[in-house]
Every structure is written in structure tokens, then in C-alpha cells.
């Protein structure tokens, strides 16, 4: 019997699951809102809440713990500066999970996980290739 066993496996190996949640946490910190399946969003929530709490505490040791999870210096800096400042007065509950219907292909329940009091400008930043127009070719 599987009584008292917490967490889901998502049909992935341990390393794949850890990498997936690391990537999803990076995306959530960067864009402040992501759409994924509802079970993944529910399992991502405590990971991100813990990271934001580390950012609020500050300090080198906590920065190293956050980097071990995120593996991205820019996101760790955002966590320890922007997000730590934004949530300094909030004692937890930094994220919300909203239901977002069902996926077309397999009817999987979808959800949106977002940071509370998020910055709407952060959504979609640095996504995809950037087209640079050369001024010398226009004339």
C-alpha cells in the first residue's frame, strides 16, 4: 500500500523530474506566470514558495541554495532583489494556481500558476528569437 507517500512521479525519472521543476521554477520567476498541467502547477507551488522565502532571508548561503535549484544567475538575482523586495511584508502565499480548462489533444486539466502581485510587463519577456532590423538596408 502507498499510504503516506507524498508527491507525484509524472512518469519521469527522478533526475528528469528535478530538471523539469527547475526549468518550470525558472520560467515562473522570469515570466511571473506560466500555463501548465494542473498537477504540475500544484507540485511546483511549494518549490517556488520555498525559493522566494530564501530570497527574502538573503545571505550568501541562501543564494547558493537557490542557485543549486535554479542554475541561473539572472533568476537568482531577480529572486533576491526584485521579488524579495516585493514580498517582504507577506508571510507566505506568494503564488496562486488557477484552473484553465482542458488541453485540446488529450483533455488534460490545465492550470495557470502565477505570482501574487505580479508585474504584467514580465510576461513574455526574452521569449523566442529577436528580429534585428539593419538600418543600412532600409534606405
Swiss-Prot record:
GO CC list: cytosolic large ribosomal subunit
UniProt keyword annotations, A-Z: Ribonucleoprotein, Ribosomal protein
Alphabetical list of InterPro entries matching this protein: Ribosomal_bL17, Ribosomal_bL17_CS, Ribosomal_bL17_sf
Gene3D superfamilies: Ribosomal protein L17
Annotated stretches, region: Disordered: 117-139
GO biological process: translation
Annotated GO MF terms: structural constituent of ribosome
Family membership noted in the UniProt record: Belongs to the bacterial ribosomal protein bL17 family.
Subunit architecture: Part of the 50S ribosomal subunit. Contacts protein L32.
The name this protein goes by in its record: Large ribosomal subunit protein bL17
Species for this entry: Rhodospirillum centenum (strain ATCC 51521 / SW)
Gene: rplQ
